[in-house]
Structures are given as C-alpha cells and as structure tokens.
Amino acid sequence: MNLLDYLPGVPDFPKPGVLFRDISPLLANPIAFKEAIHQLNEVAKQFDYTHILGIESRGFIFGSALAHFAHKGLALARKPNKLPLATHREAYGLEYGIDSLEIQQSTLPNDAKILLLDDVLATDGTLIAADKLIRSAGFEVIGAITLLEIGFLNGKQLLEQNGIRHQSVLKS
C-alpha cells in the first residue's frame, strides 16, 4: 500500500506557493490509517523512548494511536492557553509571525525519554521548538519522527544541526 496515495497535495493552501498535504483521506480509510500507524511504529522502534510528545494538532492523532499501539505514554504540546495547569512554554518563529508551544508541567515523570511526533517535517521550526520545550522542562529528547518528510525544504538538515535525530515513514 502506497500511503502517499492517501495524502493528496492541495496547491496554494494555506497560502500561494504552498503544497499542503491533506491527511483526511488517510484518516478516513481504516486500512490506510492502520498501515500508517504500523509503519510509524516500525520507525519508532529505532528509538529507546518511554513517551511520545504529540504536537498540536495532527501530532495528537498519530501520537495517540501510536502510543496505544506501542504501549507508551503520551504528552501533548499545545498552542498557548489551552492547558489548565502551570506550563512550560517555548516561542518559535514562523514565516508569518511568532507562535508558541506549551506542555503542562505535571504531565511527565522525571525519567521520561521523549520521542517527538508530528505529521509532516517541512522546515521545521515546530519540531525544533518542541525539542527546546522538552529540554528546557528538564526531560531527555530521544529523537523525532514524522509520517511525511518534504525533502526539498531541508527540515531534516535543520533538525540535525540542532542535534535532533529524525526518521520519517514517507518522503516527498
């Protein structure tokens, strides 16, 4: 099964010049979704981790399914002001402004070894911010995985320059 068949490109979304990969068809097909989680698990086996950090919002979908499948814990990296208790926060730049990620301070055990998970690796400020967030909170980041890597944007090289080991299921 070619999972890329279930990730159609939508040109000029959310802005001109961007080719957005829509995960909706993959999620709507139970066989394709199950295969995606199976393949993410195979990639994740390369890392010695105790918890997955799912990055808002599509990282929640894949992270929760993978955590269940792999019998691992799950923590959520949320946009600001979405968590009820005290948080750690990391700001990061986007091509059109600044955003932040937060994790609740009481979520993870002290010895947690974190595997970052997002759906797509693009440039990738989000995964770098998640890495900084987790490290500044005092936890160990083991690496990062994504379902899809958009190769020409060189996100993997940026992750490596920041000391983050990355693997993906698919590359386009």
Swiss-Prot record:
Main location: cytoplasm
Database matches in NCBIfam families: PRK02304.1-5 (NF002636)
Keywords: Cytoplasm, Glycosyltransferase, Purine salvage, Transferase
Catalysed reactions, as listed in the record: AMP + diphosphate = 5-phospho-alpha-D-ribose 1-diphosphate + adenine
Enzyme class name: transferase
UniProt-listed InterPro entries: Ade_phspho_trans, PRibTrfase_dom, PRTase-like, UPRTase/APRTase
Residue ranges crossing the lipid bilayer per the database entry: none
Similarity comment: family membership: Belongs to the purine/pyrimidine phosphoribosyltransferase family.
One GO cellular component term noted in the UniProt record for this chain: cytoplasm
A Pfam family this chain is assigned to: Pribosyltran
GO molecular function terms attached to this record: adenine binding; adenine phosphoribosyltransferase activity; AMP binding
Recorded superkingdom: Bacteria
EC number(s) from the headed UniProt entry: 2.4.2.7
This protein's name: Adenine phosphoribosyltransferase
Gene3D superfamilies: 3.40.50.2020
Subcellular location: Cytoplasm
GO biological process, one term: purine ribonucleoside salvage
Quaternary organization: Homodimer.
